């Protein structure tokens, strides 16, 4: 830990191809800037390079990121509507195939203790996702999730219990 407003981390992985990973986050209560860089020490190439800038207020978070060695650009915006509801939107641009994606979503907490949450998201690719989750304790919960690909008429459904 560098200070209250900055964090720096370095990792050296001793594998068949040793890596050196360096990440840092700087900021204050209104903005944060972070980056991550991973080097393959044998081949002397950059295997990972990510950077992110976040602007934060009491009820909103706006984030801009450049990931996968500048091949993925993402912008996201989250707005707290009230204490139990959050809405968000995310736009992505993939440089390699020049494709865009956009999704919007909402999360709502239920009950006096906020142990039940529901999430709904829709994307321009024609997918709709729903998740319901009930926390019994801090680390135990039950989840029901589903996804429907509207343009392919396919769906997925899942149940999970973690104790």
Swiss-Prot record:
A Pfam family it matches: Porin_3
Domain of life: Eukaryota
Signal peptide stretch: none
Alphabetized GO MF terms: voltage-gated monoatomic anion channel activity
GO cellular component, one term: mitochondrial outer membrane
Family to which the UniProt record says this protein belongs: Belongs to the eukaryotic mitochondrial porin (TC 1.B.8.1) family.
Record PANTHER family: GH26960P-RELATED, VOLTAGE-DEPENDENT ANION-SELECTIVE CHANNEL
This protein's name: Putative mitochondrial outer membrane protein porin-like
Gene source species: Arabidopsis thaliana (Mouse-ear cress)
């Amino acid at each position: 830990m560098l200070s209250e407003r900055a964090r720096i981390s370095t990792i050296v992985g001793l594998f068949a191809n040793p890596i050196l990973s360096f990440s840092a986050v700087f900021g204050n209560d209104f903005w944060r800037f972070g980056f991550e860089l991973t080097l393959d020490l044998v081949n002397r190439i950059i295997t990972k390079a990510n950077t992110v800038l976040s602007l934060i207020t009491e009820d909103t978070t706006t984030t801009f990121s450049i990931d996968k060695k500048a091949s993925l650009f993402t912008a996201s915006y989250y707005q707290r509507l009230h204490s139990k509801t959050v809405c968000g939107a995310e736009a992505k641009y993939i440089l390699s195939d020049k494709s865009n994606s956009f999704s919007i979503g909402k999360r709502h907490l239920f009950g006096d203790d906020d142990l039940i949450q529901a999430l709904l998201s829709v994307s321009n690719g024609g997918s709709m996702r729903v998740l319901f989750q009930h926390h019994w304790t801090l680390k135990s919960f039950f989840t029901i999730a589903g996804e429907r690909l509207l343009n392919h008429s396919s769906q997925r459904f899942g149940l999970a219990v973690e104790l």
